[in-house]
UniProtKB/Swiss-Prot annotation:
Gene source species: Buchnera aphidicola subsp. Diuraphis noxia
UniProt protein name: Anthranilate phosphoribosyltransferase
Gene name in the database record: trpD
Binding site for Mg(2+) 1: 91, 224
Record's catalysed reaction(s): N-(5-phospho-beta-D-ribosyl)anthranilate + diphosphate = 5-phospho-alpha-D-ribose 1-diphosphate + anthranilate
Transmembrane segments: none
Length: 335
């Protein structure tokens, strides 16, 4: 193990096998907090390689408590976080809109570590019981098209790194692992990454994990579609990888001069999204969520982004999404 640590401290990349060994030790709690802190910091400064990410994924995947997989097609929408923008939870809001439109979504979620509030923090604010049994969550997926898999419940091995991550308060390789460790093993995925450099390595990882179709995107410094600038996309389709750019006009939308609102607290995040889901949100955030939902439809095979965006906007402005959220919360109510 010391040889592996020395390589990291000398700014050398690990191969897949070395990374697997390292993260196997981390997942079993064999690495002290001080050592783990130095590992994560050193890897962050020099940048994590694709081989290191795959090795870590393989190590943690051996510890996952798997979710009962449906026999129908479903998708995960997730961002790496760590873009330091403190934007509202677009992916969580988009998941609810997509489910209201009939798409099957199994969202892997967690509490905020490198952001003001993670998806799990927001979901709890909407009174969604993340600690319900897998059977109950599967029921909401079957009947209401959506369920949320709370990472700590399915990834017990992450507990050994949580304290260090909270102390560091910055993005680390763990931001890159979550999107590839959904306990339901979805065949489809939309992943937002915090920097453009991660696009190609992320889509290659999805290909190696045998995803049927997936899109990885980065927009204007965020891990979401942007309506302020160019969205950079890497897509996996029929075993081939494509790279392209998207602009607001591709969604039938105009460029927004102002950038997306940022939130300073969980309560502000909740209030903004609550209003949007009730059909009372501001135009920018409505359109931003609709554009992300349009990408979800595309992954499911509905290729017309403009039609997809229009459908999503109509659903958002109807207020039906909020009713859908309430139905999900009621189905998962604690006795």
């Amino acid at each position: 193990m010391q040889n592996i640590l020395n390589k990291i401290y000398q700014s050398q990349h690990l191969n897949k096998e070395e990374s697997y060994r390292l993260f196997k030790s981390i997942s079993s709690g064999s690495i002290t907090d001080i050592t783990l802190s130095s590992i994560l910091t050193a890897m962050k400064i020099r940048g994590e390689s694709k081989e290191e990410i795959i090795g870590a994924i393989l190590a943690f995947s051996e510890c996952v408590k798997y979710f009962p997989k449906p026999n129908y097609v479903f998708l995960d929408i997730v961002g790496t976080g760590g873009d330091i923008k403190n934007t509202i939870n677009i992916s969580t809001a988009s998941a609810f809109v997509a489910a209201s439109c009939g798409l099957k979504i199994v969202k892997h979620c967690n509490q905020g570590v490198s952001s003001t509030s993670g998806s799990a923090d927001l979901l709890k604010r909407f009174h969604i019981n993340l600690h319900a049994s897998s059977k109950e969550h599967r029921k909401t997926l079957d009947k209401l098209n959506i369920c949320f898999l709370f990472a700590p419940k399915y990834h017990d091995s992450f507990k050994y790194s949580n304290n260090v991550r909270k102390i560091l308060k910055t993005r680390t390789i763990f931001n890159l692992l979550g999107p590839f460790l959904n306990p339901a093993i979805p065949p489809l995925a939309l992943i937002g990454v915090y920097k453009k450099d991660l696009l190609y390595s992320s889509i290659e990882i999805l290909k190696s994990l045998k995803y049927q179709r997936a899109i990885v995107l980065h927009g204007d410094g965020t891990d979401e579609v942007t309506l302020h600038n160019t969205t950079h996309v890497a897509e996996l389709f029929n075993g081939k990888i494509f790279s392209y750019e998207l602009h607001p006009k591709d969604f039938g939308l105009k460029i927004h001069d102002k950038k997306i609102f940022t939130k300073t607290s969980l309560e502000e995040n909740y209030y903004i999204i609550n209003q949007i889901m009730k059909g009372k949100g501001d135009k920018l955030n409505e359109e931003l969520i609709a554009a992300n939902v349009a990408i979800l439809f595309k992954i499911f095979g509905y290729e017309d982004l403009k039609s997809n965006t229009k459908l999503a906007l109509n659903k958002i402005r109807s207020g039906d999404v909020y009713k859908h959220i309430i139905n999900v919360a009621n189905m998962l109510k604690e006795d």
